[in-house]
Every structure is written in C-alpha cells, then in structure tokens.
Amino acid sequence: MLLGSTNTLRISSHGKEWEGKTLTGMPLGKVNQRVKVPASDSEGAITSKIKEMLSKVGLSVSSYDTAWVAMVPTLDSSKQPLFPKSLNWIMENQQSDGSWGLDLQHPLLIKDSLSSTLACVLALQKWNVGQQLIHKGLDFIQSNIWAAKDEHQHSPIGFDIIFPSMIEYGRDMGLNLSLNQSLVETMLLKRELETKSLKDKPSNLAYVAEGLNRLNDWKEVMKFQRSNGSLFNSPSSTAAALIHLHDGKCFEYLNSLAKQFGNAVPTIYPFDIYARLSIIDTLEKLGIDSYVSEDKERVLDDICRCWMQGSEEIFLDPTCCAMAFRLLRMNGYAISSDALANFDEKEKLLHTKDIKAMLELFKASQLEICEDESALCRIYAWTSNYLKEELVNGEIPDKSLQAEVDHALGHPHASMERKEIKNFIENYNADKVSLLKTSYRFCNANENYLLAFSFRDFNMYQSMHREELDDLERWVKQYGLDKLKYARQTIRSAYFSITSSLFQPNHSDARISWAQNTVLTTVVDDFFDFSGSMEELLNLIELIERWDEHTTIGFKSKEVEILFNALYGSVNDLADKAYIVQGRCVKRDLIDIWIILLKTMLKEAEWARDKNVPGMDEYIENGYISFALGPVILISLYLMEPLSEEVVTSKEYDNLFIHASIIGRLLNDRVTAKREFAQGKLNSVSLQVVGSNGAITEEEAKEEVTRIITSHRRELLRMVVQTEGSIVPKSCKNLFWTMSKLLHLFYMSEDGYSSPTKMLSAINAIVNEPIVLP
C-alpha cells in the first residue's frame, strides 16, 4: 500500500517486503471507551454528526514527522531552524515518561515510541535546546531499547533502516545514547541487509530517505517527487530531502503544511480523499449510509472530479485507488478501470505484503462491466491467490481483517448484506490505530459514535423484521400452504433472502411481496415437478387465466384449490398495495406475470412427459422464465416506487430481468446437475453432455455454464451502474443486482435455498439474534 492507507505496516523479518496489517485490541480503558448514542438524539442530530465527519476529517499529529520538519535549517543558514514553531511544539509535548508520540500506551507500539522519541531528541540536540527534555527522552530510549529487536512489536515502515541511522546521527551530534554496542551493531547490520534487499526497489528506498544519509543518491530520490512538491506525501521524507538539497518545491510543500497545521504536522498529507472514502465505506458497512445519502453523493462527486483530473493521491495508492473505483462504480459514476492496471501485478505495489491493499484490489476486481477490462481479471487472479496463501499460512494477525479476507474469498460475487453488516458491527474496532512511519488515527471521525448508532439502528430494524416474519408464517397457515406435504417449506429462507439486503422500513410491502411470491413460486414449482398431474396443471393455469371468473371452472384437486386460493388472495392483496404506490391499477400485470411463468413450467412438464430434449438455446429461453424470478422481483418492484408504463415495458427493464434470471437458472443448474439428472430433469449441464454424445465432460459443461454466467453478470452490472440513457430507477436496478448476489450466495456449492438448514445460522443472526456489544 502507498500513503493514505489505514493499515499498520512493518518491515518483514526477511527484510524484503513491507507487510500491511491493522492494529486492534487497544487494551486500556482510555482507548477502548464505548460511546453511547443518547436515547434523546433525534435522527436529525445523528445525521448532523455524521455529516460533520464527512465534511472534513482531521489526522492526528505526528511527533516523528514534526521532528524532521523541525530539523530543517533556514535556506541561508545552517544555524537556525526554518520552522521554529515545530521545534517549540516538540518542547511542549513530551509525555510524562519522556517519550513523544500518540499517548496510546499500546504494548506492541514501543518501536513507534522509540522512533518518534529519538527523532524529537535529535531535533532538540541539533538546535541545542531543551537539555532536560533530551535527558528524559534518552532515559526512555535506554529503558525500552529492548523493543527494537523484538519481532513481536509492530514496526513502523522503514524502522530497521531509519532507527539505526538516527542513532548514528545522534552520535555525530555528540549525544550520549549509552546503548549496548552489540545491539547497535546488530541493528546496523540489519539496516545494511535491508538496504541491499531493496536495491532494485528505488521507490521503497526513496520513501525511507531520511534513514539513508550519505548513502543516498538524492537525485534518484527526487524522481519520486510529486506535483505538490512532496516525496510520497510524507513530511519526514520531504524534510530530509530539503535538508540535503534545498529544493524549492520541497520547501513550498512543507511551508504549506506549516501554514495549514501551524506547529505540528501529520504523518501524511494530503489525506482527505482516502479519509472521506474510508468514512463512506464504513457507513456502508455499518448499514447507516442512507441517513446521509445526499452528503455521500456530494463527497463522491468531489472524488470523481479528482479521479478525472488524475489525482496522485488516488492513483499512486492502491488502497485508495481500489476503494475509490469500487465506491464510484457501484454508485453509478462512469469511470474507467484503466487506472487499476498500475496494480495488475503484485510487484507493482510499493508495499508487497499490504493485506488491506490486496483486499481492496480483490473487491474492485469483481466489478467488471465489459470484456476488455482484462486488468481486473489479472488483479482478481493474483490477489485471490495471494490472500488465500496469507490466510492459510496464518500471516494475517489482525482477527477482524482476517475474518474480512476469509469472507471475501469465500463469497465472490455473493452477498447477504444484513449479515455482513451485523458481522462488521460485532467485529468493528472503533479505536483502531494505523501505522506508516509512525502511528496515526483520524481525530474527528467519532467512530465509537457510529458504532453505537449502527448497533441501535440494527436492533431497531431487527425487531420490525421479526414482526414481519411472524405475519408471513401466519399467512402460510392461513392459506394452508403448510399442508402441502410434497412442497418445500421455505418461508424463513424466502424472507431472509430479501431482508438481508432490502431492510429499510419503507420497503416493508416489497419485502412481504418478495417472500410471499418466493414461497408461492416454490410450492407451484414442486407441484409441477413432483405432484400435479397434467390435468391438474392445466386446471391451475385456466383458473389463473380466468381469475375473478374462476368459480365457473372448479378445482380438480385439493392441492389445486390450495394453490389457487393462495395465489388469488395474495396477488389481489399485493395489487391493492401496488395501486397506492403506482396510482393506477396494475393487477392485470401481476396476473400476467404469473401466467407467463406457469406456461413455461408447463412446457418443461410436457418435455418431461414426452421425453423431449430441447436444444440449449430453447432450454435457456424457456428456463430463465421458469426459474421464477418474475413474481419475486417484478411484483416487488411495483411496491417500491412509482414505475411508468414506459419503464415496465422498456427493453432496459426486460434485459435486467433476463440477465438476472439467466444467472439464477445457470447457477442452479451448475450445483444441481447430478441430482436433477438422477431425477430425469433437464439441466443446462446435462444437456451439453448429452448433446455432444459424450464429447463434452460434465466438468467442461460446467465451465461453459460458468463462462455464460460471467458474461451475463458482467452485462447486468453494466446496466445497473449505467446512468446515461437509463430510464429504470436506480433503486429498481439495484434490486436486480441484489438478486444476483443472493443467487450466488444460495448456489455457491449446493442448492442452499432448498436446504434451509444451510442458512439457519444466517437467518437467526439477521432476524432473531440482536447485537450485543460489550
């Protein structure tokens, strides 16, 4: 990862790669205090606080970087500090134990304290001030120098190069460090080995330029100077360059920091883009971004402008670039993935063991919307392999990040949003600290407050969801659907499938529709497959076609009567609700959706009866409809927001449905091929094998099915994120994408929908088990 990431980083024990991880588990009450959202806080008050966080994010002061800035002499004399206010800040901000740095008291951040303290001591010694402070600082270093060789300590980036070099600087200044000579020699040797290991990585060496002293080729270092005059947006690296070269652009950069921050500087600047992206990402993961949707859009508008202008802050940082790409693309911004080609190989990253960067790149790589985005395919391949290796080898010590990586790898293209929100809330470390060359944290992003609010928000919604599920279970019994012994009983899975993503209170009717129609399509499908005679199937279709005149027809069996009454009562009820939303009667539309579905199911029943084997194209043309997403999605959409006749009859609307349905049909076929073949049912996998007369194996057929799924998923996502020329409302398009992610979840390795026990823990987590925070 480059600057701006929220990871903790350290030099690996092999001295070849910089590894990313996030610090968690701050042990002291001072750091771990929970913030409660007052019960009296209105939604407006809560929203106001979140808006404030989005408007501007501050970063903690860096004693380490401030010390390097304080060491810069005036350009016309080496006897005066160029930034005397920074020197004054150092003199006023020593901790009681003699150290400098964030007062975290974290037992694994002693190397960070050593580095910051020695840098501050050097600044004081250079200008011959604060002798008492120097002595206290040296006492701290001498008492804690053991941590410098402790591999269990979290190491700031470049510590093994910079810290021993600062010891040499101190000796040259006449400091009496009183350190064990053997230990110092060991550190110097390690520095040499580390430096040699990075000789073919000039950017890595340039980033820790302050630790290379006379060994450094400063002209080579300055090749990495950015347009704002900095080296890697790092005040310490830039200060070191200014000390040696008196570069005008370096001076302008540091002078701008002095004007903006006054006495002390952060460890990275600028950082605004990444910080605001991080807060938006956190709001989405906590499930509370809808409270500030307009502010979120304004922030993303700003970031999109920066993207279009080629911002170095975005494009030179893989974590920032990948996150910006993901959030912008999924929120409908027309941006190219070309920028990510800079990271399509692991070796192109500055820090090649940065887990957070790898994870962000992995997530971004799954957002392919056209065939020529080959860079995304390459990124997906190498990041997935790398993350799997790190996970298997136990190389991700942060448990929260480890869980996130494990989930991401296990659920590509799949999602149950509400369960992920709950996991994120339960594992969220609101007090996380990040580490570049020194530790830092966002100082005005009250993440404890966000955590407490999301906790309250989740449990409030969950109570509402439990009531809805109770109503649905009564509905099943009301129509006698539980008496259909041949049918799968799926009300919990059906409700879970939509509640996991469409959870807001204003979508209650849409959720009810989704769940009811999921149950109805399931029992009807089972009736057509296993229980109903051809006479009964035709009877049911005729009843639906006649609708209000059904009493003149009669029922061929009790099962037909139960099914029709459930359909008739439920569709009429949903049509009445849809009338309120649409301002017009759409009952005929809802009935026609069911008739179209039943006729495709009938065709498959006729194929089975007559032992006809259709071609692949004919099978898919019929099968995407018989997969039965029509009543589930299309009727629910009528209950979400007004949809004009132009929208529901448009080619765009139709294609969204087709792509989602084909994805579902083929995902189901891929995991049920053996079972359905044994049952004598048609399947896209078995059709290929049979149609080729054995020339195609089952595995090859599954690979072809996977290729088709990928193509339709890519096209579906393109349509979902596209805004130009689109007439389908964004929330409606998102529901098709939600269905795709749910289908990938249900059919990852087996038919999870037909095996509700596989989803039992997730169902309970979302509907029955409230979040309990310590």
Swiss-Prot record:
Q: Origin organism of this chain?
A: Ricinus communis (Castor bean)
Q: Which InterPro entries match?
A: Isoprenoid_synthase_dom_sf, Terpene_synth_N, Terpene_synth_N_sf, Terpene_synthase-like, Terpene_synthase_metal-bd, Terpenoid_cyclase/PrenylTrfase
Q: What is this protein called?
A: Ent-beyerene synthase KSL4, chloroplastic
**Cofactor: record remark:** Binds 3 Mg(2+) ions per subunit.
Which positions are annotated as binding Mg(2+) 1? D525, D529
Specify which residues bind Mg(2+) 2 according to the UniProt entry for this protein.
Answer: D525, D529
Q: Name one GO biological process term.
A: gibberellin biosynthetic process
Keywords of the record: Chloroplast, Lyase, Magnesium, Metal-binding, Plastid, Transit peptide
Q: Which GO terms describe its molecular function?
A: ent-kaurene synthase activity; magnesium ion binding; terpene synthase activity
For Mg(2+) 3, which residues are the binding ones?
N668, D669, T672, E676
- Reported cofactor(s): Mg(2+)
